[in-house]
Amino acid sequence: MKTYLEIQVPLRYDAAWFDELRCGCQHTGIKWQTGFYHITMVFVDKTPTDVDLRPLLEKYLNRYSAPTLTFDKLDAFTTMSGMHIIYLTATEIPMSFLSLIEDIRSDMKDAGCIIDSPFRLHVTLGRIKASVIQLASVQEMTKKVSLPAFSLTLEDVDYRVFRGETIYEIKLKV
């Protein structure tokens, strides 16, 4: 089964920069995400059914403090499935956060999980089929937005079945 570990990002849909982005992309057909903003720390393409990953997650997450990330860039990329993803990211990622993610990913692989995609820090804001508009056009629209750098502390982590129930959740200490 497919599973993923995500850390929630408390974004506001009505933030001025997000309104500006949506206005600048009107009439494109972009489907905007209206909530449940998160960073996928690990997407597991195949999770062994006989392995309980909760102890592995607890080993790392019980002692890890909530990271504060400064978001300062909007951009877009194209997925293997042919969707353009409009996203928010941080150009400087704390090393402790990257190390945590790499350690968890490594231990999950050692436990028999198949993880095909590398980590890419992004918060999905919207999606559109690549056949509708060129990536360069979407990227040009994101560059026109006045995005002030802002910092958020990320506390809530969920491990879930892809498009399914939550297996494990924790609130990181602040």
Residue ranges, per PLM feature:
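Extracellular/lumenal ectodomain signal focusing on beta-strand-rich modules
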Residues: 71-73, 156
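Internal active-site segments that recognize and position negatively charged phosphoryl groups
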Residues: 151
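Acidic/polar active-site rim loop that often engages polyanionic ligands
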Residues: 81-82, 118
